[in-house]
Amino acid sequence: MNASAASLNDSQVVVVAAEGAAAAATAAGGPDTGEWGPPAAAALGAGGGANGSLELSSQLSAGPPGLLLPAVNPWDVLLCVSGTVIAGENALVVALIASTPALRTPMFVLVGSLATADLLAGCGLILHFVFQYLVPSETVSLLTVGFLVASFAASVSSLLAITVDRYLSLYNALTYYSRRTLLGVHLLLAATWTVSLGLGLLPVLGWNCLAERAACSVVRPLARSHVALLSAAFFMVFGIMLHLYVRICQVVWRHAHQIALQQHCLAPPHLAATRKGVGTLAVVLGTFGASWLPFAIYCVVGSHEDPAVYTYATLLPATYNSMINPIIYAFRNQEIQRALWLLLCGCFQSKVPFRSRSPSEV
């Protein structure tokens, strides 16, 4: 009888302990919160409590008996799918430029740099998903997030370099082509990639919020001060691109006006071409701004205590810019279209005329 009572008491203690653990997990923001947030860190208790910043380690959920499986966040799945599409598109562009001697010109070197940066960004999104759920650790988180920062910084820098190249090709049309060399373009890209790599190494070298959770940004483990620097750099790049595209539009309209004076009227073909060119520039800049501006603004005004869904909802569209870049800067180009046909069809003779286009053409 005493043994039965003791067994009953032990069972009650186990039940009470289990209920207390479940309540504690719920209070700490566990699976019962019902929100799409980031996976909670394994050592959350030592970090000072849960918050809404984008975490980089996975939360464990119950699987088969004796096995714990990571609970997959649907937002992370979307980012991984986006990264897969980005990597596939840009890998094709890099392969086309690398395998076609006619595409090894300064203009296509810039496009190749953009495609390489976007390819690395896509691979980084895939690796982030894999490591987050298979090898969750703070060291791996720092490496993957630094890799993504460097890749996206190189992508934005390459876009700026392409914009500068287009502006100079129009503003100094008579002398720019003779002065522009592959060596100069390579030196420019080497400088931009060095700066981008430095921005990506900062979290790994210690500029992170692992030691002080209150200093975290909306993307953990990036420190709020580091994210503020990245956002300020983006706003500066966006402002320069906006100014240059406005200047490009002014040059285009001035050339159209000169043609009109020579011909005493602006012929409909010239007017249509001018409007089309200005419209294309608006699409290019609008796509870039619509993709990155929401995330850059939220990085400045957001807090690590805000729901993580806000971070995901602004970060996902930012990745779409790397998905659209190959379409805008590569696949619309006739030389790349011809190289693609030759790659897919072997000795197929494309009917697309091989005409060298200037960097001012989108």
UniProtKB/Swiss-Prot annotation:
In terms of InterPro entries, this protein maps to: GPCR_Rhodpsn, GPCR_Rhodpsn_7TM, GPR6, GPR_3/6/12_orphan
Q: Quick one: where's the S-palmitoyl cysteine lipidation? A: 345
SUPFAM superfamilies in alphabetical order: Family A G protein-coupled receptor-like (SSF81321)
Q: List the GO cellular component terms.
A: cytoplasm; plasma membrane
Extracellular domain ranges by topology:
1-74, 131-142, 206-230, 305-309
Which compartments does it reside in? Cell membrane
One of the protein's GO biological processes: positive regulation of cytosolic calcium ion concentration
One Pfam family cited in the UniProt record for this chain: 7tm_1
Cytoplasmic topological domain residue ranges: 95-106, 165-185, 250-277, 332-362
The positions making up the signal sequence are none
Q: What Gene3D superfamilies does the database record attribute to this sequence?
A: Rhodopsin 7-helix transmembrane proteins
Q: Which topology term describes how it sits in the membrane?
A: Multi-pass membrane protein
Any one Gene Ontology MF annotation carried by this entry is:
G protein-coupled receptor activity
State what this protein does: Orphan receptor with constitutive G(s) signaling activity that activate cyclic AMP. Promotes neurite outgrowth and blocks myelin inhibition in neurons.
Similarity section: Belongs to the G-protein coupled receptor 1 family.
Please identify the protein, giving its name as recorded: G-protein coupled receptor 6
